[in-house]
Curated annotation (Swiss-Prot):
May be involved in transcriptional regulation. It comes from Homo sapiens (Human). It comes from the Eukaryota. CDD domains: KRAB_A-box. Residues 14-85 form the KRAB domain. The gene is ZNF2. InterPro entries: KRAB, KRAB_dom_sf, Znf_C2H2-type, Znf_C2H2_sf, Znf_C2H2_type. One of its GO terms (biological process) is regulation of DNA-templated transcription. GO terms for cellular component: nucleus. The keyword Zinc applies. A zinc finger (C2H2-type) spans 173-195, 201-223, 229-251, 257-279, 285-307, 313-335, 341-363, 369-391, 397-419. This is Zinc finger protein 2. GO terms for molecular function: DNA binding; zinc ion binding.
């Protein structure tokens, strides 16, 4: 038997349109958000499976739509036209008329289940039959033409049934680090990058790396300046529809994501996930310099600036620099005018609500932050952090003049004033 070249084997694969999921308007409206998210995962995974076969597949419009956060394509089931397919199209890499072991490749069973549709948004890629001929007919040895006609109507109903089966199947892929479960291995792989810190998708413009391809796609729009999704209330524009949806909840006040522990609600799922780490004590983001761990990646990023000494956020009014944008915002309110937030107990005013909240703990005596070593309690987390350095011996603040180290920032500032009085820079 003659060897089959990789090119020939590639030609025997199915097209993307064969595995695309199609819903009608009515079917789509019945799906809840988590099912719609799964739909996107299934579509993107099927597309990536076709691409992984080595075929020169152009990116269909529906995939482009999904990456931008648009609704998927939907078609009307009425007036569907007939479409003819060969009775046996090989989905395997070998030149065999059929797949003998359906359990061999799970994706192959799904692909075969999806035959019989055509989408106006998916360009038609060429399908080759096992005998190498291209088209919708397969000649039998006697020369008879055998055809299998499936209406798109039937194909869509078949696909919809399969989609609902996928949407209701159990999650069987479990993360060994945190125990979270997923429907498929690719979703698990993407999730595990949050633990490993892997970022395989690099931006060619600025070099910034991302853990997900969709995040890179959204980021690329920042270079092009394209912000196609505009808020109808305040006209603020966004790169993708999902960001616009989250933003609009600020105007509506909708907070659909609620914490089961304390009942606090949030605008988006990621904020809820970060919040829940307060209850679980999970701190997955560790500093490689000092080993300190944090519950949020943004807090780790700000912390690492302490080691580098870089303060990227500078006040345009006075030139003072800060580690975080929130600190800069609080500072700039001092330039803007009178403080807005006043304490009802003593009348002291503050520029932001968080500072007022911290201050009010003085009156209430609330000290929620307790040292695990000695039991001493504090009204502010930062004071607990400074106190814990007494036990650990950590001194992260270094004098740039003499190299002496200190456990608190205020101590190094006080120390450096001595040099300022002596005229030493």
């Amino acid at each position: 038997m003659a060897a089959v070249s990789p090119t020939t084997r590639c030609q025997e694969s199915v097209t993307f349109e064969d595995v695309a999921v199609v819903f009608t308007d009515e079917e789509w409206s019945r799906l809840v958000p988590i099912q719609r998210d799964l739909y996107k995962e299934v579509m993107l995974e099927n597309y990536n499976s076709i691409v992984s076969l080595g075929l020169p597949v152009p990116q269909p419009d529906v995939i482009f739509q999904l990456k931008r956060g648009d609704k998927p394509w939907m078609v009307d089931l009425h007036g569907s036209e007939e479409r003819e397919w060969p009775e046996s199209v090989s989905l395997d890499w070998e030149t065999k008329p059929e797949i003998h072991d359906a359990s061999d490749k799970k994706s192959e069973g799904s692909l075969r289940e999806c035959l019989g549709r055509q989408s106006p948004l998916c360009p038609k890629f060429e399908v080759h039959t096992p005998n190498g001929r291209m088209g919708t007919e397969k000649q039998s040895p006697s020369g008879e033409t055998r055809k299998k006609s499936l209406s798109r109507d039937k194909g869509l109903r078949r696909r919809s049934a399969l989609s609902r089966e996928i949407l209701t199947k159990e999650r069987h892929q479990e993360c060994s680090d945190c125990g979270k479960t997923f429907f498929d291995h690719s979703s698990l792989t993407r999730h595990q990058r949050t633990h490993t810190g892997e970022k395989p998708y690099d931006c060619r413009e600025c070099g910034k790396a991302f853990s997900h391809r969709s995040s890179l796609s959204r980021h690329l729009m920042s270079h092009t300046g394209e912000s196609p999704y505009e808020c109808s209330v305040c006209s603020k524009a966004f790169f993708d529809r999902s960001s616009l949806t989250v933003h609009q909840r600020i105007h509506t006040g909708e907070k659909p994501f609620q914490c089961n522990e304390c009942g606090k609600a949030f605008f988006d799922r990621s904020s809820l996930t970060r919040h829940q780490r307060i209850h679980t004590g999970e701190s997955p983001y560790e500093c490689h310099q000092c080993g300190k761990a944090f519950s949020q990646k943004s807090i780790l990023t700000r912390h690492q600036l302490i080691h580098t000494g870089r303060k990227p956020y500078e006040c345009n009014e006075c030139g003072k620099a800060f580690y975080g944008v929130s600190s800069l915002n609080r500072h700039q309110k001092a330039h803007a005018g009178d403080p807005r937030y006043q304490c009802n107990e003593c009348g002291k005013a503050f520029f932001d609500r968080s500072s007022l909240t911290q201050h009010q703990k003085i009156h209430t005596g609330d000290k929620p932050y307790e040292c695990s070593e000695c039991g001493k309690a504090f009204s502010q987390r930062c004071r607990l952090t400074r106190h814990q350095r007494v036990h650990t011996g950590e001194k992260p603040f270094e004098c740039t003049v003499c190299g002496k180290v200190f456990s608190s920032k205020s101590s190094v500032i006080q120390h450096q004033r001595r040099y300022a009085k002596q005229g030493i820079d």
